[in-house]
Amino acid sequence: MAQKKDYYEILGVPRNATEEEIKRAYRRLAKQYHPDANPGNKEAEEKFKEINEAYEVLSDPEKRKLYDQFGHAAFDPKYGAQGSGGFSGGFGGGFADFDFGSFGDIFEDLFEGFDIFGTSRRRKEAPRKGADIYVDLELTLKESVFGCEKEIPIYRTEKCSVCGGSGVKPGSAPVRCQKCGGTGQIRSRQATFFGEFTTIKTCDACGGTGTIITDPCRECGGTGNVRRQRRVKINIPAGIDDGQVITLRGEGESGIKGGPNGDLHIKIKIAPHPVFKRVGQDLYIEVPITFVNAALGGEIEIPTLDGKTKVRIEPGTQNGDEVRIKGKGVPNLRSRGRGDLVVKFIVEVPKKLTEKQKELLREFERLSSEEGYEKRKHFWDRIREAFS
């Protein structure tokens, strides 16, 4: 007779495995090698039997203790182990005398629809949360910076107000399903290698409810819910950014079997602005100025989201120079502060000049010195150093 395989090795767990680790390994293997998942596969049937034998011992603290001390001999009748907590008859006689007691909860989870213990329990559908609804909401840059209140239409399933969600016409009642006898389940027997199994399926006539609605509610047509449009108000906080999501609890689809409603998730989309660009908490604006403004300096009026304001141009301003106007940017969602407005100057050179303008510029050039052009002076200094 071939030597029995180690029970720990069968389940693929170490000898110091916890009860939860053993149970988890058993669940995985039992599902993999269950006869109903491997019809006609003798090797799978033997493996399934082996897995159950190992779990029967290792899931019981007393039996596991004996096995750790004496090995397979602890449960071999010829060694007299039966009186010490061993199996009554071992496994030689197949599954006729096999104790499935410790497997009930596991099989119930793994093989829903298979009643291997002959029970007739009916599993009730638990209350479930309704589905969430996802929508996009476009805002202007100004709305996102200062916040606002929006009202948007959404379509969602709600409990029928006429029948209260029962689907039955007020004043009438559902009748017992004749096909399943009110159990909500259809049972059939199936012969397998291990004996006769009873398969349980949801009744297709009543959908598992055990009752049939013969006089449905006219408002919902017997479904218990209706599809309606609702307008939902949303408070947009100041400083919200593109891509952020606002969640309104309980504004989603209606709950199932008395469960809570789902949630409404609003994803913010900020439309591009023709003048301003947002980067974090700051706003950026490009302001074109003449080369005369850049050279002489001065003060100009520019737009902000708060209204018009004046900004100073320093004499000698270069193309791309920036100035910051404090507190004219985007509010911080988590504090009271605001970012800045960053003004970038774009020095514009005229493409067309009159003869008089050209003459004046040539005169200006004759009167200019290298000292007035720092970048130009440094450039030629580097050239001279490089080739000297």
Swiss-Prot record:
Domain of life of the organism encoding this protein: Bacteria
Annotated binding of Zn(2+) 1, by residue: 160, 163, 217, 220
Zinc fingers classed as CR-type: ranges: 147-229
Cofactor(s) this protein cannot do without: Zn(2+)
InterPro entries with a match to the protein in the record: DnaJ, DnaJ_C, DnaJ_domain, DnaJ_domain_CS, HSP40/DnaJ_pept-bd, HSP_DnaJ_Cys-rich_dom, HSP_DnaJ_Cys-rich_dom_sf, J_dom_sf
One Pfam family per UniProt: DnaJ_C
One CC-aspect GO term: cytoplasm
Gene3D superfamilies assigned to the protein according to its UniProt record, in alphabetical order: DnaJ domain, Heat shock protein DnaJ, cysteine-rich domain, Urease metallochaperone UreE, N-terminal domain
Residue sites binding Zn(2+) 2 per the record: 177, 180, 203, 206
Compartment annotation: Cytoplasm
One Gene Ontology term of the molecular function aspect: zinc ion binding
Note on how the cofactor is bound: Binds 2 Zn(2+) ions per monomer.
Subunit structure: Homodimer.
HAMAP family in the cross-refs: DnaJ
Purpose: Participates actively in the response to hyperosmotic and heat shock by preventing the aggregation of stress-denatured proteins and by disaggregating proteins, also in an autonomous, DnaK-independent fashion. Unfolded proteins bind initially to DnaJ; upon interaction with the DnaJ-bound protein, DnaK hydrolyzes its bound ATP, resulting in the formation of a stable complex. GrpE releases ADP from DnaK; ATP binding to DnaK triggers the release of the substrate protein, thus completing the reaction cycle.
Domain comment as written in the entry: The J domain is necessary and sufficient to stimulate DnaK ATPase activity. Zinc center 1 plays an important role in the autonomous, DnaK-independent chaperone activity of DnaJ. Zinc center 2 is essential for interaction with DnaK and for DnaJ activity.
Stated name of the protein: Chaperone protein DnaJ
Native source species: Caldicellulosiruptor bescii (strain ATCC BAA-1888 / DSM 6725 / KCTC 15123 / Z-1320) (Anaerocellum thermophilum)
